[in-house]
């Protein structure tokens, strides 16, 4: 099994594998091109994102700056909007449903490191997927950790750190993020 397959399947892998390093460089080059493109060139911007991400709807907008590790593990649904400074560490799948709205300075981090310092110091990593349902709004400065599923019709309040699943039809806030009421 290749290191890339291990990574995508959530197994311990070596992020310094030559193929993975080259994949990250390709993604960083596309992010650089996207982030430095004239804002008026909307069609060119869309083409870069479509070539970078694993799947997109037809209607999306990502404000620069945007950064990801690989891109091919990210899927965004129809009517996706992200404000400035979105970071997606997509060592495995990060899936967004339709009608997703993301405030500024948000991060979605699938990358995990062993708690054991000897394994961690060897450079080993693993990843856990993130799944976001339909009709979800993230306030600014939200962080979502790998292994989390966020249901449909959810609002995540600004500054929240999401470490556990959030059920459908919820408003959730805080660090750690917790449901405060149903909608």
Predicted regions and their residues:
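Flexible, glycine/small-residue-enriched loop-and-beta-strand segment within the central core
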Residues: 66-150, 175-183
């Amino acid at each position: 099994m290749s290191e890339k397959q291990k990574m995508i399947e959530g197994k311990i892998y070596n992020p310094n594998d030559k193929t993975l390093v080259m994949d990250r460089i390709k993604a960083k080059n596309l992010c650089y091109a996207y982030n430095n493109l004239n804002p008026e060139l909307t069609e060119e911007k869309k083409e870069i994102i479509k070539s970078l991400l694993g799947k997109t709807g037809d209607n999306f907008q990502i404000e620069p700056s945007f950064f990801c590790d690989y891109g091919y593990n990210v899927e965004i649904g129809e009517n996706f909007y992200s404000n400035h400074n979105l970071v997606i560490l997509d060592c495995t799948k990060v899936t967004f449903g339709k009608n997703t709205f993301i405030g500024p300075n948000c991060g979605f981090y699938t990358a995990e490191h062993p708690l054991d310092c000897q394994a961690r110091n060897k450079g080993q990593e693993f990843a856990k997927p993130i799944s976001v349902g339909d009709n979800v709004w993230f306030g600014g400065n939200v962080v979502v950790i790998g292994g989390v599923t966020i249901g449909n019709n959810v609002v995540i309040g600004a500054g929240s750190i999401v470490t556990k699943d959030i059920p459908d039809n919820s408003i959730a806030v805080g660090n750690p993020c917790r449901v405060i009421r149903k909608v």
